[in-house]
């Protein structure tokens, strides 16, 4: 077991982000429902902007970047040592459009997401109790992944990587950009991928 400084800081980070006693059984229940982390590639896709279910001014993954993501996820699958008959993707995202697209594009690979609480943001001004709880559940479930594919400019992705101890996570390159999204509004149904 690695008991160096990095391991100590990971333990400390997990304590700081320690979920409440009410949330721990939810995380365990979701883990049991989703499946073993040994068979899981954890993927965090942070869209923001107009692709997010709740719009923001700042965009991360845009439509242009999104077009490349099925190929990036396929590359992660092809490079994985996880047996194909057991492999699944655990997806954490702020966009139901992303979930729908990856389910369609990556068949027959199972795409699994948290089934509890509400998809949204933990950003000040947009956070609700439900979205914060979902963020915690997602954070712990993604961090348990055998392999990771994370959004390069997302603080959530960096925390997940740090908590996981996985120094070799793959990245979806998605720099911050400004969007025409109106802060806090539900995504316009005319926006599609």
Question: Residues of each region from the PLM?
Answer:
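Secretory-pathway luminal glycosyltransferase catalytic domains
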Residues: 1-85
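Donor nucleotide-activated moiety binding/catalytic core segment of transferases
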Residues: 112-145
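Short, charged/polar "capping" segments at the starts of alpha-helices
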Residues: 95-102, 182
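Short, solvent-exposed loop/turn segments at secondary-structure junctions
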Residues: 46-50, 94-98, 154-156
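A donor-sugar binding/catalytic signature common to diverse glycosyltransferases
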Residues: 135-180
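Short internal beta-strands
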Residues: 90-92
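Short, aromatic/basic amphipathic alpha-helical patches
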Residues: 99-109, 159
């Amino acid at each position: 077991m690695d008991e160096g400084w990095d391991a100590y800081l990971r333990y400390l980070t997990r304590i700081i982000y320690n979920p409440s006693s009410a949330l721990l059984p939810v995380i365990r229940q979701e883990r049991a429902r989703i499946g073993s982390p040994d068979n899981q590639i954890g993927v965090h896709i942070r869209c923001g902007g107009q692709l997010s279910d709740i719009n923001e001014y700042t965009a991360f993954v845009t439509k242009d970047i999104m077009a490349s993501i099925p190929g990036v996820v396929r590359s992660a699958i092809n490079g994985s040592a996880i047996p194909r008959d057991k492999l699944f993707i655990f997806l954490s995202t702020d966009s139901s459009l992303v979930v729908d697209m990856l389910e369609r594009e990556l068949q027959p690979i199972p795409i699994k997401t948290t089934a509890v609480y509400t998809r949204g943001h933990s950003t000040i001004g947009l956070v609700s109790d439900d979205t914060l709880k979902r963020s915690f559940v997602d954070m712990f479930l993604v961090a348990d992944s055998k392999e990771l594919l994370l959004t390069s400019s997302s603080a959530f992705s960096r925390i997940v990587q740090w908590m996981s101890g996985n120094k070799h996570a793959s990245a979806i390159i998605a720099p911050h950009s400004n969007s025409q999204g109106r802060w806090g509004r539900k995504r316009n149904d005319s926006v599609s991928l």
